[in-house]
Regions:
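Non-heme Fe(II) oxygenase catalytic core, chiefly the N-lobe of the double-stranded beta-helix
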Residues: 1-157, 163-168
């Protein structure tokens, strides 16, 4: 199952960008949708924007693996466990380093949905409240007014800024 996401949020320093190339087009489907994370943030109710301005969540690749997101050979999984920290915190409202714009930064596959905390005080949000807020935020990128569709042709290359968009 696919979902709106930005790549490698489980890394301490997530990737700047991603690049994909179409070497063979399927007979139908296969489009990639992009959603503007800044517009998604701006579209939130003021109360939620204020609430998430100091909230961070723990992103962990193990959450994705435990949900059956991808099958990884045991040797690679062991190597990842040895090299990659057990969860990293990222703010839900993340400031783009070049534009200065705030963007909604959330990945439902890697985020521990019960892990939200105030990064100014260290105070954890309650488990149920955290899960409810995450569920609400995950809906935001699904709104068509923030999206564009890229229809692939053989040989096309797409390059995107993971700090500014999500893709599906």
């Amino acid at each position: 199952e696919n979902s709106w996401h930005t790549d490698v949020t489980w890394m301490e320093s997530p990737s700047l960008c991603s690049i994909a190339q179409c070497t063979e087009c399927p007979p139908f489907g296969g489009d990639t949708l992009f959603s503007d994370s800044h517009a998604a943030f701006l579209g939130l109710p003021e109360k939620i924007k204020s609430q998430i301005s100091t909230l961070s969540g723990i992103n962990d690749y193990r959450v994705f693996l435990n949900r059956g997101g991808v099958q990884v050979p045991e040797s690679l999984a062991n190597e990842m466990k040895a090299q990659i920290p057990f969860g990293v915190a990222h703010p839900l409202a993340r400031q783009h380093p070049e534009t200065g714009k705030l963007a909604l930064y959330i990945h439902g596959g890697f985020l521990r949905h019960d892990s939200l905390f105030d990064h100014t005080t260290g105070e954890a949000m309650g488990c149920e409240a955290s899960k409810a807020l995450v569920a609400e935020l995950l809906k935001q990128h699904s709104r068509p007014e923030y999206q564009c569709r890229f229809q692939w042709s053989e040989g096309d290359i797409a390059f995107w800024d993971n700090r500014a968009v999500q893709h599906y």
